[in-house]
Amino acid sequence: MTKYIFVTGGVVSSIGKGIVAASLGRLLKNRGLKVTIQKFDPYINVDPGTMSPYQHGEVFVTDDGAETDLDLGHYERFIDINLNKYSNVTTGKIYSEVLRKERKGEYLGATVQVIPHITNEIKEKIMRAAKMTDADVIITEVGGTVGDIESLPFLEALRQMKADMGSDNVMYIHTTLIPYLKAAGEMKTKPTQHSVKELRSLGIQPNILVVRTELPVSQNTKNKLAQFCDVNPEAVIESRDVETLYSIPLALQAQNMDQIVCDHLKLDAPAADMTEWRALEEKVLNLKKKTKIALVGKYVELPDAYISVVEALKHAGFDFDSDIEIDWVDSQELTAENVAERIGSADGILVPGGFGDRGIEGKIEAIRFARENDVPFLGICLGMQMACVEFGRNVVGLEDAGSAETNPDVTNNIIDLMADQENIENLGGTLRLGLYPCKLKKGTKTAAAYGNEDVVQERHRHRYEFNNKYRQLFEENGLVFSGVSPDNRLVEIVEIPEKQFFVACQFHPELISRPNRPQRLIKGFVGAALANKESK
């Protein structure tokens, strides 16, 4: 029978629930258990696809095309599993489904209410995710903090799960903050006590407390929390600030958190073999080189908007024994006059995805600088589209080359709306989303980066594409289309072969990178950037 673990948060948001959940998932997986994981987001949006990156951060796309919370990226990278549309559930999705059923008459004339209809739908989403993956354990994180009005239906559903499934099959983990008051010289447990009190008032008694802290938590403090929160002292787990996130699973294991979970859920599983993970941590903490990458974006004020890109760069750096120094460059501030001064010291230049016309010309200037000065370059999604626009303007000679997304009236629309997108009115969930195949051209830098495979699979999130009526003209001027869809209709990857590394892709390679298995195109870019640095 599937076991259910629910992770909630208290005191403050952004406390690291997602990393705790992902780390526990890794520990249980390394015990030989089949693990899946999901995130509940209490906002009313159906998904984050139309939300501003400034409000939500990155939108993480799964293989099946779901636009999801960035925590799913942490889950996939830590546990090394591919998630799906059932792994991220929002209030908007729940209410949409309940209202759809009501309109179809599936409730047989009943008055539709939060309890039982909304809570039943929430529970159905939990059990469906577990059933689809045949998981031994499903971990469900609830976004926000206990006390938020938006999360009440989710917490009520979690409370009901214990009665539905039995106490031996359900476990509650509560993550909180223990602030340190320098003036008093002590840690304060009262916020955690009140958070647990609030959770218990909703009918949920946590089995484990994970306390976020800057400093070590004394045994006396743990005993105090155990007494007031009614948990065992050994179930008060310290989550101290660490140098790298990859230390957290090992820190939790050192405190027997995974064993406590297995004991409570009556899971007979061998101890987790974390040898490979420990070697990864050792490598990460002792990198000998440093590579500087200029990340030229329009949302750089909020690094979470590019979190998978940053993590994928780090993964690639691990393979070269190199730390990655990110130079965050606001594309709105780049001009032809200051671009050399601003990004001239970078070992490599990366232009990531985005939407809209703000900051576009700055991205184009960064790409021009990379091409003209042979600085290793990687363009992703919008970065690929702007690389084609820059090539059209400054190499092909189409001075008014542009994108129909940012200028619908442009004459030379190098980037145009995909044919199957022309009559779509709704913005949400209508992009080209999910995993698609890409056929590689032999003898290219792209093919070499992928180990000379014929076809690769990558995740996409876009509405516009390269306009094929310009393909021959661009090829005649030196741009190589090194990756296309199997039917040859969609340009997936372009490159300039005589450069050290000038590659741009329509898909999002960062979404499938893993700490022990870096995405190959990004690894090729980082390798070229490091070689560029060493040749200076």
From Swiss-Prot:
UTP binds at S13, K188, T189, K190, P191, T192, Q193, K224. The active site is at C381, H508, E510. Its EC number is 6.3.4.2. Residues 292-535 form the Glutamine amidotransferase type-1 domain. Pathway: Pyrimidine metabolism; CTP biosynthesis via de novo pathway; CTP from UDP: step 2/2. GO terms for molecular function: ATP binding; CTP synthase activity; glutaminase activity; identical protein binding; metal ion binding. GO terms for cellular component: cytosol. GO terms for biological process: 'de novo' CTP biosynthetic process; pyrimidine nucleobase biosynthetic process. L-glutamine binds at Y54, G354, L382, G383, M384, Q385, E405, R463. It is an enzyme of class 6 (ligase). Mg(2+) binds at D71, E141. Belongs to the CTP synthase family. CTPSs have evolved a hybrid strategy for distinguishing between UTP and CTP. The overlapping regions of the product feedback inhibitory and substrate sites recognize a common feature in both compounds, the triphosphate moiety. To differentiate isosteric substrate and product pyrimidine rings, an additional pocket far from the expected kinase/ligase catalytic site, specifically recognizes the cytosine and ribose portions of the product inhibitor. Catalyzes the ATP-dependent amination of UTP to CTP with either L-glutamine or ammonia as the source of nitrogen. Regulates intracellular CTP levels through interactions with the four ribonucleotide triphosphates. This is CTP synthase. The gene is pyrG.
